[in-house]
Amino acid sequence: MSTVKHQPWAAGASGHMTHPIFGNVWIKDTQGLDYEQPDLKGRYCNKLFTWLEVDMHGRCWMCCPSWLPYNIGNILEDSIEDIWNGPKAQELRKQIFSGDWHYCQASFCPVIQSDNLPTIDDVLDGKQSAHDFEKQMLQNKTVTAPVLPTYINFSNDESCNLKCPSCRTTKLLYTSGSLYDKRKAINDKMIEAFLTTPTDRHFGIFVTGSGDPWASKIYRDMLYNLDGKDFPNLSISMQTNGVMYTPKLWDRIHRIHNNLRDCRISLDAATKETYEGKTRLNGDWNLLLSNCEFLDSQQEKYSSFNIIYDFVVQYDNYKEMKQYIELVKERFPNHKQIAFSMVSDWGTWSPEVYNQKCIWKEDHPEHQEFLDVLKDPIFDSERVVLGNLTSMRRKALQQ
């Protein structure tokens, strides 16, 4: 990819700031990252036309907030219809046609980093799959969508059975009280909009970008009550730590087995010591591996059910990256992908601790050792995805 100068609201800036259109914005820290902003003129991202993510405050996003940190409205204040085609949503879509992409945090986006954004021409020519309404929007260069989002990310409940230091400072589990009520009110609005009336519409939900779907009473009740027969073309994807995803729970959700699609299980370690002592506090390594072996066997029965094993790279675990690939290949042979990404700032660490964890920063004392790890040919393995670490490996191989 060719490169252009950093934009004022993109990868060159960090911290809290006030944007003239979007108000208060938090740009994640990328200082110390050896990175150049790519030239994305003529490229296309379907997130801006299809994706809605709702967080615990009711704020609505058109992508992961770390990658596109501008919310387009609040579900507690406005209808989904008004938010989806409101002025903020339209403003974000304009960058597809202007080609400057200055709102995206390209350094954190794994799709941009791995150069996997299709061209607009490929979408229009049918070389890249897309909905008909997407093609019509591209042809007409319109920034108002004719249909509601086709992918909905439930990120409104942070409840989790673990307390991973990169994500939170204490265990969060909402089962009653005002904080629970607020999160359930948001969830009820989303259910009302997308999961109340049976339909054969093709759409998907993702649970969850905020906690664990099985630790959350809100999500657990929602998934237990869903009947796939009412939504035959609904795809259900999940992100979970896997500890509670037991064979017993699997049997409990038998009515949605045929709706299950991608399941992202985040281990962030290749050893029991690192997992239970550093990256996944309150976790149970042996139970996790047992659950994953069971889920791996279910992939043989349900061809659309795919498991992606995630690994967020930081100082505490980067030396286990190779071992992680070997572990997944050996123990879970039916996996779809082994996906890596770099740690980002969720506000749980002090600046000093965060910088110590960011092995990707050029000024980190062990940055070269990290690059040496990335030189291993195992990262060329089929089904290994480096995402936003792609540029790091490119740098390592150029040494």
Pin down the residues of each PLM region:
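Short, intrinsically disordered, charge-biased short linear motifs at domain edges
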Residues: 29-33, 50-51, 87-99, 148-155
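Extracellular structured ligand-interaction cores
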Residues: 49, 57, 69, 101, ...
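Disulfide-bonded cysteine motifs in exported proteins
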Residues: 40, 99, 104, 155, ...
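Short cysteine clusters
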Residues: 45, 60-64, 104-109, 160, ...
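Conserved alpha-helical substructure of the radical SAM core
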Residues: 72, 111-263, 273-300, 327, ...
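Membrane-interface junctions of multi-pass transporters
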Residues: 38, 68-111
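Radical SAM enzyme [4Fe-4S]-AdoMet core and its adjacent flexible, acidic
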Residues: 1-78, 82, 124, 155, ...
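Residue-level recognition of short, well-ordered coil/turn positions
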Residues: 88, 100, 231, 300-303
